[in-house]
Amino acid sequence: MLKKSFTIGCAFGLIATLQGCGIGDSVQAQSSPSTLATKDLSAFVNTYWYVPTDYLLGYSYNASANPKLTAVRDQTIWHFTSANGGYLMGCSFESTDNGASWKPSTVVGSVTVNNTVSLGFYSNILTVGAGQLVVSGGQPAFLMQMTAGVGASGLTHWAYMLPITPSDRAWTNLPGTNNISVPTATAAGC
């Protein structure tokens, strides 16, 4: 499988095992209505991201339950399918029941030149994610805080989202699932 090079941290001159922070990298300024710098995110197209074991913990809220808060293992997979003008688009798949079922949603979000991330996940309930594109363990990672709900129930989860490819062990056995693979989890599409 072709490995992608990720361009993150160019605004700060960050050096990691990533490529693309040199002269000629695509950083474009948009000036309407205010100046917002964005970058070329095409390296993220056709990439998958997942939650490693250490970051599965999330909390579910249910107003009619006792206790109202319950710890859950929240595995989420992102598959970015396109990028345009500083926006990433694709599909997200979430499971809080060890991979027995997956909730698909369409994801649209932006990554600014200073690596601030804002993602919207659209399905029957809107999920909002905010965070940073960072380097963790020498690889790119999304450090995200996610919240979804309708008032009487909801889910809050923070995690590092790491890239995953078919050569990774977790590809065929996602953490927090009963031996579920990325292809199985994403088979329904969004």
Where are these regions (language model features)?
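Bacterial N-terminal signal peptides that target proteins for export
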Residues: M1-C10
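N-terminal glycine/threonine-rich, aromatic-flanked beta-hairpin/loop signature
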Residues: Y59-V117
